[in-house]
Amino acid sequence: MSGRARVRARGITTGHSAREVERAPRDLMVTSVSPGDNEASSRTSVISQPHELGVSSGDGRRTLVEKRGNGRQDFVDLGVCTREKLTHVKDSKTGSSGIPVQLATNLFHLDLPQDWQLYQYHVTYSPDLASRRLRTALLYNHSILSDKAKAFDGTSLFLSEKLDHKVTELTSETQRGETVKITLTLTSELFPNSPMCIQFFNVIFRKIFKKLSMYQIGRNYYKPSEPVEIPQYKLSLWPGFAISVSRFESKLLVNADVNYKVLRNETVLEFMTDLCLRTDMSCFTETCHKQLVGLIVLTRYNNKTYRIDDIDWSVKPTHAFQKRDGSETTYVDYYKQQYDITLSDLNQPVLVSLLKRRRNDNSEPQMVHLIPELCFLTGLTSQATSDFRLMKAVAEETRLSPMGRQQQLARLADDIQRNQVTRFELETWGLHFGSQLSLTGRVVPSEKILLQDHTCQPAFAADWSKDMRSCKVLSSEPLNTWLIVCCSRAEHLIESFLSCLRRVGGSTGFSVGHPKIIKVDENPAAFLRAIQLHVNPDVQLVMCILPSNQKNYYDSIKRYLSSDCPVPSQCVLTRTLNKQGMMLSVATKIAMQMTCKLGGELWAVEIPLKSLMVVGIDICRDALSKDVAVVGFVASINSRITRWFSRCVLQRTAADIADCLKVCMTGALNKWYKHNHDLPARIIAYRDGVGNGQLKAVLEYEVPQLLSSVTECGSDARSCRLSVVVVRKRCLLRLFAESGHTLQNPPLGTVVDSEATRPEWYDFYLTSQTANRGTVSPTYYNVIYDDNALKPDHMQRLTFKLCHLYYNWQGVISVPAPCQYAHKLTFLVAQSIHKEPSLELANKLFYL
């Protein structure tokens, strides 16, 4: 790129940075860079002196200290060692129960010499040089470094071999004749298992993927040269890989998984044009702003992604900007000269994207101007994700079978091992990309489902929906006084629906009385007025049959009935009741939800531990106010783990760390005491929604809140024992069961607690779901605090049991039920209610 545009902010409010946004191309970045020379003469001298500096990475762009502010956070977690404090698993954290199963993985060995080390040097220049390109050229021109593997980010130099002295001074001369003194000071000798070294390995693999002609978008790498087109929906899929290097137990392994980037073959300009045709011109700019700000776009001329932070309607492509050399050019001329692109619409505005700041960087915000015509929308809209046919078309291309996924991974390994350039890059650093890891897992026994009059062992262990149709639930409250609010065109569907609902209720033990039916006009305000008029203290439940899935119908009803006038509610779409052939299935699901919302219990599994409370905690961001965190807390209040206490708290915090857990836990313990006349002997809390780099904060800030509540509520004679388990549904690991010459998904209940786990943590993987198509993902569990000192077998088996207790699905789910309940609660509040639900509903699963 020959120039760098300097675009100034025009009163734009800084928005939240998107995780996927890459650094801008140098052509349109707002920054001041001093011009410099490319070549220089040099001479070397050596001097020894003490020097202590902060550690930095070999990123090539930012120091590690800077990256911690807005880069990869998962490396920070590697410094949190929890297992050493858990004496019962200090020697061994592996279980022994279950049937052994041979598993292949998507982990590859990264081999290196036994005495391998990495040496990090801090590099200073006198006088200081602003240009990293010039810094690199002057440094690399010295013969002392010419035969060594090296990586330099402008501040830190990484070498595979140690220099003769701790401090080395070099002297260079620029083409202008200026003398520059370069000082290299050894700051760290890094071993392969150090977090800094782990990050360096990831940097090396970023270079390798670049050499394989892949482009980095967010954390993943894609091949735009091999797109998969879905023309009927104007979509393109870029195949690629997610990759991470880390130490698993005693081995350094590369974790690689197949990934796809969904791109729309629709530019922002086309989107704006279509929106203009459908919107009144008086509110077009406002509507356009609401629709586009926050979206991620891709510029295909450089394969970079950006987050749209604003739209500048005052700037057009014909406007001029100043390049790095001081000359001016227009956007039209710039794109023609740089990319041979001719802009067709000279009246379009420009999009504004704010770039991520470096940590402790107080300089002017950097931003880029983007041309809508050249920006392609990424991802899928909520409307698209609700389109069954569209999602099916996407799934047919992306939902790979275990064998299909393995073939893609084998191809990647072959590319890395056979490509001369990538192999040389690895060999330069003494690394070798090795074979795939295979290991032995265990399959824990399937669970029996306990009902009121029957114990069933489902024929298909992951699904017992057929068994539920003819068996009575554990307990239910009769529904005598309730309302149905509907519009006139849905009235004819009510009688057949009620008939089917009573039929289902008769077989499951759920008594359904005749409701009061209220007809209203087809608008959200009419529904809300009818509810306000007819709901009284005797009403047990309100059912609303909605004419469409417009969000304002659902939101206004749920907000009023969850907070202002707390009554359980059930929303059903008219088109759902129109599916006469599926009415029995629809009525069964609705009956189950209504039973739960009235405080009923559907089924149970055998829990050997008595007086056990399980807790689920989840955190997300409010959809309307991104500075508001929504904390969901759900705890069991009986030994059978079938009744729940639910509370949601809104807090204003920058990080997704809860500060309300003490009050939530105290409320749960009080409810438990009210039901059982004693406190629980054990509490196991499952914490979902923990982001990368937050493990230490959870351990040091959230766990003490729970402990404080437990200590204050407990008596001197006996205090509750607490365990805290971090849950992660999204993990890179994939497991494939080896069956002859083919691979298939691992059996339900497969546990992996060795080789693919971390030595510093008490962790395991559990596969608690099945898939007819595609590849199953295991869920990752990390026990960070454990006063209960349960054996690994018992912790793993209990976790699997809890995956059977989610009442909104008659089958096994991927996480323990309290986690999923907490997720459903936070989702409802963050997306629809935007305020704390009334505690009058705390004993009911009103959010299902």
UniProtKB/Swiss-Prot annotation:
GO BP: cell differentiation; epithelial structure maintenance; meiotic cell cycle; piRNA processing; piRNA-mediated gene silencing by mRNA destabilization; regulation of insulin secretion involved in cellular response to glucose stimulus; regulation of translation; regulatory ncRNA-mediated gene silencing
GO cellular component: cytoplasm; nucleus; P granule; piP-body
Domain Piwi: 541-834
SMART domains hit by this protein: PAZ, Piwi
Location of the protein in the cell: Nucleus; Cytoplasm
GO molecular function: molecular adaptor activity; piRNA binding; RNA endonuclease activity
Region described as Disordered: spans on this chain: 1-20
Domain of life of the organism encoding this protein: Eukaryota
Domain called PAZ: residue spans: 267-379
Keywords, sorted A to Z: Cytoplasm, Developmental protein, Differentiation, Meiosis, Methylation, Nucleus, RNA-binding, RNA-mediated gene silencing, Spermatogenesis, Translation regulation
Distribution of this protein across tissues and organs: Expressed in liver. Expressed in testis and pancreatic islets.
InterPro entries to which the protein is assigned, alphabetical: PAZ_dom, PAZ_dom_sf, Piwi, RNaseH-like_sf, RNaseH_sf
SUBUNIT field: Interacts with PRMT5 and WDR77. Interacts (when methylated on arginine residues) with TDRD1, TDRKH/TDRD2 and TDRD9. Interacts with MOV10L1. Interacts with TEX15 and SPOCD1.
Functional description taken from the UniProt entry: Plays a central role during spermatogenesis by repressing transposable elements and preventing their mobilization, which is essential for the germline integrity. Acts via the piRNA metabolic process, which mediates the repression of transposable elements during meiosis by forming complexes composed of piRNAs and Piwi proteins. The PIWIL4-piRNA pathway acts in the nucleus and mediates silencing of active transposons: engages with nascent transposable element transcripts and governs the piRNA-directed DNA methylation and subsequent repression of transposons.
Family statement: Belongs to the argonaute family. Piwi subfamily.
The protein's name: Piwi-like protein 4
